[in-house]
A protein has these predicted regions:
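A detector of low-complexity, intrinsically disordered, Ser/Thr/Gly/Pro/Ala-rich segments
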Residues: 1-2, 13
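Structured catalytic-domain cores with a bias toward divalent-metal coordination
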Residues: 2-7, 21-158
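Sec-dependent N-terminal signal peptides
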Residues: 7-13
Length: 158
């Protein structure tokens, strides 16, 4: 049974958390971006039956409300033109002039990129393009697909 003190503590904790993360912030994985700013970082793909990984992303959260656009490069590790295009785009978007949010996934399949493989991840031999929506308990490629689906695609309008 929850006591009155416990209820007050839980309510206070809920209020404190909601004040720390403003309604105007945008969060992807471990990355939270205030309105009108741009932040780059990594989304963690946890270890499972094999190694974990990270997914480098940049989030440009516009000064005004609007739709969310997700651009994902590097589904296959050898797709260099989209990877470099998103890196260039990152420097060309002004969050103060943007309505909405852009999520740039620079390299979706880091194991394949580092392994310099064309279609398949060297860790499990799977093609990320065929793994969506993914499996949180599957192989590294299945977990990457799951993270991309739940953290990126599900938040995007386009």
């Amino acid at each position: 049974m929850i006591t009155t003190v416990s209820k007050v503590f839980l309510f206070s904790l809920l209020i404190a958390i909601s004040l720390c993360v403003s309604a105007d912030d945008f969060t992807v994985g471990e990355i939270t971006v205030p309105r009108g700013e741009q932040v780059s970082g990594f989304i963690t793909v946890p270890e499972g039956m094999d190694e974990g990984s990270t997914i480098p992303v940049t989030i440009v959260h516009g000064a005004s409300d609007g739709p969310v656009l997700a651009l994902i490069a590097g589904i296959h590790g050898y797709e260099y033109p989209p990877i470099t295009a998103l890196q260039a785009m990152r420097t060309q978007v002004d969050p103060a002039a943007l309505s909405g949010t852009i999520i740039l996934v620079h390299i979706a399949n880091m194991p394949a990129f580092l392994g310099r493989t064309i279609y398949y991840s060297p860790g499990d031999g799977k093609n990320l393009n065929r793994m969506f929506p993914g499996d949180p308990d599957g192989s590294i490629t299945q977990r990457i697909a799951h993270i991309l689906t739940t953290e990126i695609i599900d938040q995007a309008n386009y």
